[in-house]
């Protein structure tokens, strides 16, 4: 008989076992706390000096299709920092996969799945979804994200248009690991803004127990926002508001000059005929109508006089 062939592949000695033992959430939480502590050390949030892949207690992966600008792509930056590993088309990911073809929302019910197998995203352009081969990015746990607002500079303020790092962070917040979201968002100057914009919603989703409850929380939020729209408070002295001009002394709907002076004069001094009953009121209305007609003709006559003087 020949020699026994040496073991190969993920199950080989020294390699990663094919089936990992179940991970306790308590031990995972301790690893998350250690990773957060390492990320806040001096120099950890400055880019290349950040923590390596061993600093994160779970796997982060990404299918990168090359649709985005490499200088603005948050997924590529995380990959350069060693926080995310790139997958090729056709590779299967065993953890939670954020995909537009998912059938249910990510929820706290996925907490153990994320702790055990991690999260993967699809880095593609929102404008090219029709040509994205989602069937070649395989996974057993496809999920969607509920209503959230983007804070990245490209799609700031637009719902659902999250970048890769925002998708990772949202998933961690929903399943109950917000410290992991902080670790990733610290790599971007605008990262904290994502949590500030969506704090209320993320807390609502994290308090749910199932995908159905997350869907219900989303629907309730959107219904309340539609029923009670809040008027925008505008600071007239805010130079960064984006408004080119504005007059705080006049309502926006006003289309003609106010006639407060004429109305106040008429109300304060109605004339001697006002004490004589209804007949006097109709007479006053006729006089006011004639007066308004004369005022309407006056600007036209003045304009004709100006044009005549210009011709002369």
Swiss-Prot record:
Broadest EC class assigned to this enzyme: transferase
Annotated positions of the Phosphoserine modification: 24, 259, 264, 282
EC number: 2.5.1.157
Modification Phosphothreonine, positions: 261
GO BP term, pick one: rRNA modification
Chief subcellular location: cytoplasm
A cellular-component GO term for this protein: cytosol
Transmembrane segments: none
Positions contributing to S-adenosyl-L-methionine binding: 74, 122, 145, 160
Catalytic activity: an N(1)-methylpseudouridine in rRNA + S-adenosyl-L-methionine = N(1)-methyl-N(3)-[(3S)-3-amino-3-carboxypropyl]pseudouridine in rRNA + S-methyl-5'-thioadenosine + H(+); N(1)-methylpseudouridine(1248) in human 18S rRNA + S-adenosyl-L-methionine = N(1)-methyl-N(3)-[(3S)-3-amino-3-carboxypropyl]pseudouridine(1248) in human 18S rRNA + S-methyl-5'-thioadenosine + H(+)
Key words of the record: Cytoplasm, Phosphoprotein, Ribosome biogenesis, rRNA processing, S-adenosyl-L-methionine, Transferase
Residues covered by region (Disordered): 1-21, 224-312
Keyword Phosphoprotein: yes
Subcellular location: Cytoplasm
GO molecular function, one term: S-adenosyl-L-methionine binding
Keyword Disulfide bond assigned: no
Role summary: Aminocarboxypropyltransferase that catalyzes the aminocarboxypropyl transfer on pseudouridine at position 1248 (Psi1248) in 18S rRNA. It constitutes the last step in biosynthesis of the hypermodified N1-methyl-N3-(3-amino-3-carboxypropyl) pseudouridine (m1acp3-Psi) conserved in eukaryotic 18S rRNA.
Protein name per UniProt: 18S rRNA aminocarboxypropyltransferase
Source species: Homo sapiens
